[in-house]
Structure formats: C-alpha cells, structure tokens
Amino acid sequence: MSKKVTNIVEELVTPILADMDLELVDIEYVKEGKNWFLRVFIDSDNGVDIEQCGMVSEKLSEKLDEVDPIPHNYFLEVSSPGAERPLKKPKDFTKAIGKNVYIKTYEPIEGEKEFEGELIGFDGTTVSVTVKDKTRKKTIDIPYEKVASARLAVIFF
C-alpha cells in the first residue's frame, strides 16, 4: 500500500525546512469543491515571512515534481499557521505554556469536552489549563492522550 500524501510531503519538506532553520507545523491535503489543496504550514521562533514561504514553496514544488505522489492537479500553499496555530506535538504544548489555548477532548473531563484558558503546564502526559468557571478560575488537568485537538486562542479585549 502506498504512503499517504501527507507522509510523503513531510519526508520531502523536512530537509528543506531544516536547511532554512524552519519547522513544520502541519500538512493538510484536502478537496474543497472541485479542487485539491496541499497546504503546508511552517513556522520558526521568529515567525515566517512571505519570502520564506515562497522559497519553501519553490523547493517543495521541485521535489513534488520529481516524486509525483499526487496523480491529479492540486494547489500547493505554503504559509504560516497564523495566530491560532494548532498544537500538534508535545513540543508545541511546551512552547505554548503561558499562552491562551483552546482544547477539545475525545471524552468529557469534569463534564466538559471543550476548554479555553491559559496553558499553565505540560509534563508530557498531562496538559494543565486554567479556565474561567463563572467568576473564579480553576485548573483542569487533561490527560495528553485525551486531547483531540488543540490550538492557540486569540483573546479580543
């Protein structure tokens, strides 16, 4: 059985990003309407700019043309993950400590499956978030394996 497109793209883009001191955040391969999109989200400690996205796009496009893992036409998009960056890997959670996050879980924890608040800790097995409970704050400890999805959350004042 052939590898998933996202796995192949990850193998192709990782050395490109390493050479540019960038990191891979996520890869999406989706059909929207009649069109297929291959989206590669990149970042660094200093953020990314349009020139870096363009360079990665050019280099990755060359590699994709060589390997040709996608049998039909598609649009390649390389961009920053934006302000509400997904938290996919353990190191993403560690880097997000002290920031506002939005987390969905596979099953209820203390009667809830969605949490928004400040990420105050992550030890590799437990994600600790301070959430607002009516007029006070409380800490919720979420087992890492129960996190279905997580992202940074922007607070508007």
UniProtKB/Swiss-Prot annotation:
Q: Which residues form the signal peptide?
A: none
Q: Where in or outside the cell? A: Cytoplasm
A cellular-component GO term for this protein: cytosol
Q: Which UniProt keywords apply?
A: Cytoplasm, Ribosome biogenesis
- InterPro entries the record matches: Ribosome_maturation_RimP, RimP_C, RimP_C_sf, RimP_N, RimP_N_sf
Per the record, the major location class is cytoplasm
A Gene Ontology biological process noted in the UniProt record is: ribosomal small subunit assembly
- Protein family per UniProt: Belongs to the RimP family.
Q: What does this protein do?
A: Required for maturation of 30S ribosomal subunits.
Q: What is this protein called?
A: Ribosome maturation factor RimP
Q: Which organism is it from?
A: Geobacillus sp. (strain WCH70)
Please name the taxonomic classification of the source.
Bacteria, Bacillati, Bacillota, Bacilli, Bacillales
